[in-house]
């Protein structure tokens, strides 16, 4: 039921916020008119209740918070638009995307048909918009399912030509509108086709589109459609890069229809299998949610999501094709908007491979010449150089080949060329910073000699001793070692010991002004004095004056106030707005004191600036042999806390996933069992092993309501890059907030803000663990919650000698009982390096075989769900099943009884009637939706004269 207060709500035209007419009676005519426009243009079926209008109003109010104002917009990029009344451009942050999609989903489920489009990123799924223009006298639909299949088959062949697509990713969604629409004297029909699990750049989609048009002409797949437009305009090129893509369920305007999914093809051995079965409820909430997500052109969040190129594809050949396409567009004089469109597109969309300036290219070539023979001999460092060069500029292939020749015994030109092509499949994080770092390590003398020319020029510029000139000199010397992450908050990082370390107010850089630059200028002064003694009278005076002037410069360099000014200037030069966003974002790197372990490559190596690592295990990586005493002690400990071998293997595999920041399991792990069972000690060992990558979380984050997004959340802000996150044991009365649990495990971007700092956005990398002796209450019964939960029992018991009974001392300990090692806490820190080696071993197994949950885990999880199912508990206490279908109880009567029952059996707030209705609708087969009642069930208090009462909860049939 909708309350009277809800019915009085409207949308303000100025703020878009929901207001109450009882408190805002002076609504202007303008706002009233705007509300009418909004409601009239966003259509809804007449049968829907007034309450459902609020679903649209809530969505609109949310979007208005992120509206980009001004005729020419603002500096904020536009992520979404409304292409019809009430119109508007919006910038919806990544961390608000989930909330936006939930509100949008609610509006679509409620029957609304908005006009919302989303704009493209620099990468995204393959999307195709086919627009068939037909004469006015041909108003029917001419394309058939054969046409659709031909389109998909042709495009599949093109995709396989260019991309290495797995079978599971080769899914094609086809969406159609209800019927052709008459517009400007022509009928417009069409198809929307999406490949949601393939990620590409717009540049490659241009090449694919060009090939598709050629094949479509060759095979005449549209010959039965009386087209008035040519094939170039049938396949809209704008949808690849600039034209807004309609969100699923939206439409262009009130005279058009939304596109709805009609086919879902999976390509297996070049055969198309349609997984849409006639009669499927494609408009259920679950399906709508799925389609909204899969049809979004903004569904990918990183260049790492790019689908790799197929074997043998030459990126240079793709780039050459793009240049021809660009020339073709520029020469197309028939389209007056072509040049404008090309300008809007920008050159970067027509470049498939990276290219830098000539100056940077020459610099890169000179740096590679300084690399050592050892770097060319070791496969991994050799390959790392290749990845770095290919990520900087495609023209550096010959330089990699020349570098490879430093190890003649391993050099193969063909292998270099093949790997180079593969390197372009996916970009890396490597930049010029890595080249500089390698060169400075391999040949420091020649490296500093190479930089000397530029530095000498800056030293001469610095003779005026201004803040800016000195800052330029300082940053040129250390530009790849120091980064300013925030000018406002004075956050600086220094690359030291294989990782980035935050330095307070750039104090180490500040010290270099007095320690290094003073020496640079003192050396320059000595040179000038020496030259002055060997010059003629005129030049002698000039050299002498310059040398004297350096004395003033040195004095400034030792002045605290001057140094503060230099550091402020340095911040402007060294500021990297993306530094904090990229920090600790590589899921496959683990930082040690002596280097970095690359999980993807399976090697230990030196760290480099482009690794962007700040977190560290805080000890050196050492390979330990399995025969070592440490390994034996660790295995002995593990055998006691998990005597069952399958459970022990599972635990080790699970903990090994904490090495990686990927969250493919999307699980929330509950470690449970009576006290003194070893689970806390196991987590303590993991803490020592992971170091900075392990950080506990306050249980209140899981049990209390979430604070507003604007308030500080330091308990979340310091979890960026963390790999394992245990929660304290909850109180007996605590309930788990499943919303937060889903956020931590769902892979969505979250927002957090440390005290007095700007908000940060990141995807959680950590695996969440809840340690508890007694399982807490979880009232949610949705499958999304229980799919994530995994209950891991710890069945052992550790007994102290001082607490043992006489029977234990005399007859020995029972099964799964062990004597407690009172010195274990002192031993655990010494096991960290051995345990790390053990986890790395199991991580390699995990990458091959995945994580398989044992029966014991599944069994305890199912039992936990039954225990938490408050509705099943209530039905078992209050209802009995009868064979008479005329017998039953309404949901509202059932709810009234449940409220009283709940007060007697539980603490906290009773679930609402909507949750109860949802439960019986989906879990009880005798629910009558039209009557809103549960048939074949009566209250136990009722007396059935026919003797049909069944007082047995086991006879209640539960679906799902």
Swiss-Prot record:
| Protein name per Swiss-Prot or TrEMBL | Putative helicase L207/L206
Q: Which organism is it from?
A: Acanthamoeba polyphaga mimivirus (APMV)
Disulfide bridges in this chain: none
Per the UniProt entry, the Enzyme Commission number(s) are: 3.6.4.-
**Residue ranges of region Disordered?**
1-32
Q: Where is the composition biased (Low complexity)?
A: 12-25
Task: Check the record and name the NCBIfam families matching this protein.
Answer: primase_Cterm
Q: Alphabetically list the UniProt keywords.
A: ATP-binding, Helicase, Hydrolase, Nucleotide-binding
Q: What top-level branch of life does the organism fall under?
A: Viruses
Q: What class of enzyme is it?
A: hydrolase
What InterPro entries does the database record attribute to this sequence?
A: AEP_C962R, Helicase_put_C_phage/plasmid, Helicase_SF3_DNA-vir, NrS-1_pol-like_helicase, P-loop_NTPase, Phage/plasmid_primase_P4_C, PriCT_2, Viral_Helicase-Primase_Cplx
MF annotations from Gene Ontology: ATP binding; helicase activity; hydrolase activity, acting on acid anhydrides
The residues covered by the SF3 helicase domain are 646-807
Q: Does the keyword Flavoprotein apply?
A: no
